[in-house]
């Protein structure tokens, strides 16, 4: 799936609105992930996963800010995400299917927070962008 110029513009434009709320949006997306797909909690046994926890806000912020870095380097996702790809493939060994689940909960969260901006074209662009990110993050899996 190749991102068009209009897809890239939509991702970058919405990122500008997401950035100031990165921790809150990330925490909400993770909380939604854990509620909808409880099996994903296994990677976070050392976290406080309760609503409003600092762990959710901190890690959610890391996830969303990593997407921001990807958006800033949207034409070279491989280089921008290389370190994270190594981390997820070799150290964390996250089930690759979980990236699709997280992609879904991120999109739901974005739709709730940015209902006017997150129209069909923007949602399609973010869906493609998150799929590209997931492809890069799982590219080093064996």
Curated annotation (Swiss-Prot):
Its job: This is a larval (tadpole) alpha-globin.
One Pfam family it belongs to: Globin
Any one cellular-component term (Gene Ontology): hemoglobin complex
Presence of the UniProt keyword Transmembrane in the record: no
Protein name stated in the entry: Hemoglobin subunit alpha-3
Disulfide bonds: none
Assembly, per entry: Heterotetramer of two alpha chains and two beta chains.
Tissue: Red blood cells.
Family: Belongs to the globin family.
Alphabetical keyword list: Heme, Iron, Metal-binding, Oxygen transport, Transport
Residues where heme b binds: 88
Domain Globin, first and last residues per copy: 2-142
CDD domains (UniProt xref): Hb-alpha-like (cd08927)
Alphabetical list of Gene3D superfamilies matching this protein: Globins
UniProt: O2 binding residues: 59
GO process terms (BP): hydrogen peroxide catabolic process
A Gene Ontology molecular function term of the record: organic acid binding
The organism's taxonomic lineage, starting at the top: Eukaryota, Metazoa, Chordata, Craniata, Vertebrata
The keyword Metal-binding is assigned to this record: yes
């Amino acid at each position: 799936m190749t991102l068009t110029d209009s897809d890239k513009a939509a991702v970058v434009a919405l990122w500008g609105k997401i950035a100031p709320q990165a921790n809150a949006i990330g925490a909400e997306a993770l909380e939604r992930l854990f509620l909808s797909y409880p099996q994903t909690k296994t990677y976070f046994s050392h976290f406080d996963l309760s609503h409003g926890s600092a762990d959710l806000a901190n890690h959610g912020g890391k996830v969303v800010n990593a997407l921001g870095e990807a958006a800033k380097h949207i034409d070279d996702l491989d280089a921008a995400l290389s370190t994270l790809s190594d981390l997820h493939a070799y150290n964390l060994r996250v089930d690759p299917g979980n990236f699709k689940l997280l992609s879904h909960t991120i999109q739901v969260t974005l739709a709730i927070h940015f209902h006017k901006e997150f129209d069909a074209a923007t949602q399609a662009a973010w869906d493609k962008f998150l799929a590209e990110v997931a492809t890069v993050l799982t590219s080093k899996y064996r």
